[in-house]
Structures are given as C-alpha cells and as structure tokens.
Amino acid sequence: MARYFILAVALLLTACSSTSKKPIADDPFYAPVYPEAPPTKIAATGSIYQDSQAASLYSDIRAHKVGDIITIVLKEATQAKKSAGNQIKKGSDMSLDPIYAGGSNVSIGGVPLDLRYKDSMNTKRESDADQSNSLDGSISANVMQVLNNGNLVVRGEKWISINNGDEFIRVTGIVRSQDIKPDNTIDSTRMANARIQYSGTGTFADAQKVGWLSQFFMSDWWPF
C-alpha cells in the first residue's frame, strides 16, 4: 500500500512541476507580413526625377494597408482590490439534572447522577487581495489584415537581450484607423481585443518562478 502511495505522490509532484512552453524569438505567429508590390518598369530617361519613386507631400503617412508599420504606445495601468469574510457560530447546551429512573433519582455511591452536554463552534475566515500593474513603453507592429469595416489587425514583438536573459514584448489587437494619430502612433488603450505580453527568459526569469514543491503546497491538491 505504501508503494502505491509513494507512486501517486510522485505523479502529483511531476504534474505540478510541468510548465508551459517557453516562448521563442522569431515565432511565425508574429512574423511580419510583406506587401506584394507589382513590379514597376523604370524608363531610363536620364533624369534624376522618376515618377515611380515619387511621393506626395500631402499623403497620409498613417498605417492603412497590409504590411504597414504602426507604433503602439503602451500605457497600461490596472489596479484591483478584493476583500471577503464570513463567520459561522453554532452552539448547543443540554442538561438533565437529576436523572430519574423508576420514580427515584439515579445515584452512584449515594451521589445523584446528572447529565450535562455543551458544544460550541466558531469559524471565521477573512481574505484580502490587492494587485496593481503598470506598463509603459512603445513597440512597432505590422498591419496583418485590413477588415471590411476599415479596422486594422496589428501584431508584433520586440526582443531585448540583457546579460543572462532575454526580455520580450508581444502585442496583438485590432485598431481603428480614426484612432491613429498623425505621427502614426496609437495608445494601447485604444486597441480592441488586445493581447499584451511582457515577460522574459533566462536565469533571472527562472529565479522568479515558484518551485515545483511550493506549487504543490499552494495547489488544490494540498488537503490542508
């Protein structure tokens, strides 16, 4: 029996020690999309000015087609606070003094026999949770798709290698063309269905993770 118990505990610890797949750079999901431009024929006229390479001074530089680049300004701040508590009290008291049997008191050694029972229970639980996060910065992303209503699906990532680890930012979401500023930037708070991930890999990132044994004690499998 003890052998099966040890085997079950080992399986539970193995399950608790499993971690999600580590992110890698150059993920195909975040790979940029390059627009397919038709080949242009440049006539050799001998002039410095070429019509095929000209750009209007009054054209809109904001992203509007697949393959364009847009800068997302990260301005994220969240704060959550929650508290809960409950208290349960229960008690009972019973006494039978003296005890009668056959019309007379029941006694032992001349001492009247009585019965007393008293029980009480008091359970009190309190919990508090307070969490706040903030993220500031910027990241340039690609326009991956233009929807029928003109909204843009944007996606991009940025990797930074620092000493013994890598830090990365990944962003994906949907933006409105009207919300893009003249300098081709948009606040992250204006993105719909936004997915913003800021994390890292390496020695420093691993040091912040909880060990597998601590995960077991904090999981639902811990009976206490």
Curated annotation (Swiss-Prot):
GO terms of molecular function: cytoskeletal motor activity
Key words of the record: Bacterial flagellum, Cell outer membrane, Lipoprotein, Membrane, Palmitate, Signal
Lipid-bearing positions (S-diacylglycerol cysteine): C16
Entry's localization field: Cell outer membrane; Bacterial flagellum basal body
Residues with lipid group (N-palmitoyl cysteine): C16
Subunit structure: The basal body constitutes a major portion of the flagellar organelle and consists of four rings (L,P,S, and M) mounted on a central rod.
Pfam families named in the record: FlgH
Signal peptide, first to last residue: 1-15
Protein name according to UniProt: Flagellar L-ring protein
GO biological process, one term: bacterial-type flagellum-dependent cell motility
InterPro entries for this protein: Flag_Lring
Gene Ontology CC annotations of this record: bacterial-type flagellum basal body, distal rod, L ring; cell outer membrane
NCBIfam families: PRK00249.1-4, PRK12698.1
Membrane topology field: Lipid-anchor
Family statement drawn from the similarity comment of this UniProt entry: Belongs to the FlgH family.
Functional note: Assembles around the rod to form the L-ring and probably protects the motor/basal body from shearing forces during rotation.
Source domain of life: Bacteria
